[in-house]
Curated annotation (Swiss-Prot):
Gene3D superfamilies: 1.20.1250.10. One of its GO terms (biological process) is response to nutrient levels. Belongs to the somatotropin/prolactin family. This is Somatotropin. The lineage of its organism: Eukaryota, Metazoa, Chordata, Craniata, Vertebrata. GO terms for molecular function: growth hormone activity; growth hormone receptor binding; metal ion binding. InterPro entries: 4_helix_cytokine-like_core, Somatotropin, Somatotropin/Prolactin, Somatotropin_CS. The modification Pyrrolidone carboxylic acid is found at residue 18. SUPFAM superfamilies: 4-helical cytokines.
């Protein structure tokens, strides 16, 4: 118990000097963290797009629409209606898997600026927070029965040395997928948090 309280205190980062015992408050911290990551992902993607020529943007967007993110292999709600029908535990489980899938690829986003270097540690903190929420909602014994199938490849041959055009495509893909997945996690955690308030309107 003392260990859990310590972890919650670290996650709060000064939000409160007292141990966090209320699930609603822990959800608020997790939602705040993923909102920060989503905004950061949007900014990084926007900055990268701004550095491209108009034709490069058009071609890369066209290619991305025909491609898939690695995390697409993680089964998740197909629309807002299915999201709203999903249980809190299911939304937490999917969020955990999405965040976990970025632990290794996020290293390629680091470097060049302070915000970029914050991504990996913030993902790690978010993952810890979601895991605590999962433990509070379930014993976790059979939470990830198919986890062995979720060893996603780190975006194929992304870490090899490509030519200039291929490097642009891979960077575009990485940033676009990161933005997409952080939006998903933000949505799932927001809906799950709302479920703790029976009188709240959780409509997306």
């Amino acid at each position: 118990m003392d260990r859990v309280v310590l972890m919650l205190s670290v996650l709060s980062l000064g939000v409160s000097s007292q141990p966090i015992t209320d699930g609603q408050r822990l959800f608020s911290i997790a939602v705040s963290r993923v909102q920060h990551l989503h905004l950061l992902a949007q900014r990084l993607f926007s900055d990268f797009e701004s550095s491209l020529q108009t034709e490069e943007q058009r071609q890369l967007n066209k290619i991305f629409l025909q491609d898939f993110c690695n995390s697409d292999y993680i089964i998740s709600p197909i629309d807002k209606h299915e999201t709203q029908r999903s249980s809190v535990l299911k939304l937490l489980s999917i969020s955990y898997r999405l965040v976990e899938s970025w632990e290794f690829p996020s290293r390629s986003l680091a470097g060049g600026s302070a915000p970029r270097n914050q991504i990996s540690p913030k993902l790690s903190e978010l993952k810890t927070g979601i895991h605590l929420l999962i433990r509070a909602n379930e014993d976790g014994a059979e939470l990830f029965p198919d986890s062995s199938a979720l060893q996603l490849a780190p975006y194929g041959d992304y870490y090899q040395s490509p030519g200039t055009d291929e490097s642009l495509r891979r960077t575009y893909e990485l940033l676009a997928c990161f933005k997409k997945d952080m939006h998903k996690v933000e949505t799932y955690l927001t809906v799950a948090k709302c479920r703790l308030s029976p009188e709240a309107n959780c409509t997306l």
